[in-house]
Design a protein with these regions (language model features):
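Structural helix-adjacent loops and short alpha-helical linkers that scaffold large soluble proteins
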Residues: 167-176, 225-230
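Short alpha-helical scaffolding segments that buttress acidic/His motifs in well-ordered protein cores
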Residues: 100-107, 156, 179-189, 217
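Short alpha-helical patches at coil-to-helix transitions and adjacent helical residues
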Residues: 2, 153, 207-214, 242, ...
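Amphipathic, non-membrane alpha-helical segments in soluble helical-bundle scaffolds
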Residues: 172-180, 203-211, 238, 242
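Core structural elements
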Residues: 8, 183-192, 203-225
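Electropositive nucleic-acid-contacting surfaces
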Residues: 226-246
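Active-site cavity-forming subdomains of large catalytic enzyme subunits
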Residues: 1-172, 195-201
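A general alpha-helix detector
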Residues: 42, 102, 216-220, 236
Length: 246
């Protein structure tokens, strides 16, 4: 399975959005490849303000791929000014709202490209010292750094919450013990796993990424005698994840 991410300022973004359509030139379609938008906050600001958005060729704006946040906004505005002065040759201006509606339309029509946000993923990354995150993965549940020397891979596991509700209450001590064991086991996986490439091995050994999720939430809430859509269920879910996280 493959997933390609493209930033919203890329000159090919409009063609990229159409890659999964069932109509049009088949030579310009990729029906078996997943696609995702990698959207900077500045684009959403332009959508809200109903302003234009400028598309660039990456060879003329090489820094944009490797920066985010305020630095991205300053550099992007500078490139727009250069385009107006004629210093950049390959660019196109489009209404941001029109492009956003096209993104949503294709998502409704084909399920692609997915909507992911570059700035929140980087701002909240605990590995911002390791560089800029350029994409997520096939399921958009991990955000890790990649480079020519490192292919990001993650070791994942899940806890069955239903097994931690005993006699109508959440056994927090049992859940905490399960989390501790699961994290230890996932870390062991890093050392004994098979890696198809040296780049994947380099990434795993250097950063030791693990992801611990949950399953059985509905069953757990049922055993706690809570309606899934109730305020009490929301509070219980918060408490569950607080125990798991801390």
């Amino acid at each position: 399975a493959t997933c390609a991410y493209l930033e919203t300022w890329h000159l090919d973004i409009e063609d990229f959005i159409d890659l999964r359509r069932n109509t049009g030139d088949e030579r310009r379609r990729t029906h078996d490849m997943n696609t995702a938008n990698w959207i900077p906050d500045l684009f959403m600001k332009r959508v809200i303000e109903n302003r234009d958005w400028t598309l660039f060729s990456p060879d003329e704006v090489p820094e944009l791929h490797h920066i985010y946040g305020k630095e991205f906004e300053r550099k992007y505005a500078g490139y727009e000014e250069n385009a107006r002065k004629g210093l950049i040759k390959k660019y196109k201006s489009v209404p941001a709202l029109k492009l956003w509606r096209k993104m949503l339309g294709r998502l409704f029509e084909t399920g692609h490209p997915w909507i992911t946000f570059k700035d929140p993923c980087n701002i909240r990354s605990p590995q911002d010292h390791a560089g800029v995150i350029h994409s997520s993965n096939l399921c958009t549940e991990i955000t890790l750094n990649t480079s020519a020397e490192e292919t990001a891979v993650c070791n994942l596991g899940s806890i069955n919450l239903e097994r931690h509700v005993i006699d109508g209450r959440l056994d927090e001590e049992l859940l905490a013990a399960t989390v501790k064991t699961a994290i230890r086991m996932l870390d062991n996986v890093i050392d004994i796993n098979y890696y198809p490439t040296i780049e994947a091995q380099n990434s795993n050994f250097k950063h030791r990424p693990v992801g611990l999720g949950i399953m059985g939430l509905q069953d757990a809430l049922f055993k706690l005698n809570l309606n899934f859509d109730s305020e009490e269920a929301v509070n219980a879910s918060d408490r569950l994840m607080e125990v798991i996280s801390y």
